[in-house]
Amino acid sequence: MYKLVLMRHGESQWNLENRFTGWTDVDLTETGREQARKAGELLKKEGYQFDLAYTSVLKRAIRTLWIALDAMDAMYTPVGISWRLNERHYGNLQGLNKAETAAKYGDEQVLIWRRAYAIAPEPLPLDDERHPRFDSRYAKIPADQLPATECLQDTVARVLPYWNDSIAPAIRAGRRVLVAAHGNSLRALIKHLDNISDDDIVGLNIPTGQPLVYELDEALRPIRHYYLGDAAEIEAAMAAVAAQGKAKKD
């Protein structure tokens, strides 16, 4: 049996402000840093050790991993960093407040933009300074692979090659792996692992800074999965994520 630990980054500044973040490189809040520290302490307390860790090229995920590994006294852990683990690209929605957008377009439309499997928001124009082709960290990525928007289906297509080529072989080789990434890149991976349908994936919400453990068989099929930590706290955090795209009530 293998174990894989997945963790969404701690609360970011735009999580706090309830904005569509996507590939925008915002940092953690103090709460987010504390979540990462507590996650690392919990992993250490539960006896977890890692041979390899993986994360995206976005600082909120990288810093979450750093802080968690530091709390485990394991900063020496080798880390693989890939743009393929980035958050889903939210196109022209990036930077907009989710509740204000819901008030303008309706809760249902925002839910479609946030959670529909095959519907992407309006793309960024090619000349928009927010387009990843203007960001030096993506300079070596072929231009036709850089998204101007994505749906979850696109995110799955981006994440799975990295899973198949890097993460899964490491697990099969007996490496103990931690992945610190983002809500939607982890949803994409979980959809693959658990074979979740396109319709059912809409209801999956991943809280910030909570270690999620997958026990896998020899074929990397899930035996079971569970969050570490307080169950009531995790349920409340999931509910908060689900409510982010709703208009505020007067």
From Swiss-Prot:
<dbReference type="InterPro" id="IPR001345">
    <property type="entry name" value="PG/BPGM_mutase_AS"/>
</dbReference>
<protein>
    <recommendedName>
        <fullName>2,3-bisphosphoglycerate-dependent phosphoglycerate mutase</fullName>
        <ecNumber>5.4.2.11</ecNumber>
    </recommendedName>
</protein>
<comment type="similarity">
    <text>Belongs to the phosphoglycerate mutase family. BPG-dependent PGAM subfamily.</text>
</comment>
<keyword id="KW-0312">Gluconeogenesis</keyword>
<feature type="binding site">
    <location>
        <begin position="21"/>
        <end position="22"/>
    </location>
    <ligand>
        <name>substrate</name>
    </ligand>
</feature>
<feature type="active site" description="Proton donor/acceptor">
    <location>
        <position position="87"/>
    </location>
</feature>
<feature type="site" description="Transition state stabilizer">
    <location>
        <position position="182"/>
    </location>
</feature>
<feature type="binding site">
    <location>
        <begin position="8"/>
        <end position="15"/>
    </location>
    <ligand>
        <name>substrate</name>
    </ligand>
</feature>
<feature type="binding site">
    <location>
        <begin position="87"/>
        <end position="90"/>
    </location>
    <ligand>
        <name>substrate</name>
    </ligand>
</feature>
<dbReference type="Pfam" id="PF00300">
    <property type="entry name" value="His_Phos_1"/>
</dbReference>
<comment type="pathway">
    <text>Carbohydrate degradation; glycolysis; pyruvate from D-glyceraldehyde 3-phosphate: step 3/5.</text>
</comment>
<feature type="binding site">
    <location>
        <position position="98"/>
    </location>
    <ligand>
        <name>substrate</name>
    </ligand>
</feature>
<keyword id="KW-0324">Glycolysis</keyword>
<dbReference type="GO" id="GO:0006094">
    <property type="term" value="P:gluconeogenesis"/>
</dbReference>
<dbReference type="InterPro" id="IPR029033">
    <property type="entry name" value="His_PPase_superfam"/>
</dbReference>
<keyword id="KW-0413">Isomerase</keyword>
<dbReference type="InterPro" id="IPR005952">
    <property type="entry name" value="Phosphogly_mut1"/>
</dbReference>
<comment type="subunit">
    <text>Homodimer.</text>
</comment>
<dbReference type="GO" id="GO:0006096">
    <property type="term" value="P:glycolytic process"/>
</dbReference>
<dbReference type="InterPro" id="IPR013078">
    <property type="entry name" value="His_Pase_superF_clade-1"/>
</dbReference>
<feature type="binding site">
    <location>
        <begin position="114"/>
        <end position="115"/>
    </location>
    <ligand>
        <name>substrate</name>
    </ligand>
</feature>
<comment type="function">
    <text>Catalyzes the interconversion of 2-phosphoglycerate and 3-phosphoglycerate.</text>
</comment>
<feature type="binding site">
    <location>
        <begin position="183"/>
        <end position="184"/>
    </location>
    <ligand>
        <name>substrate</name>
    </ligand>
</feature>
<feature type="binding site">
    <location>
        <position position="60"/>
    </location>
    <ligand>
        <name>substrate</name>
    </ligand>
</feature>
<dbReference type="GO" id="GO:0004619">
    <property type="term" value="F:phosphoglycerate mutase activity"/>
</dbReference>
<feature type="active site" description="Tele-phosphohistidine intermediate">
    <location>
        <position position="9"/>
    </location>
</feature>
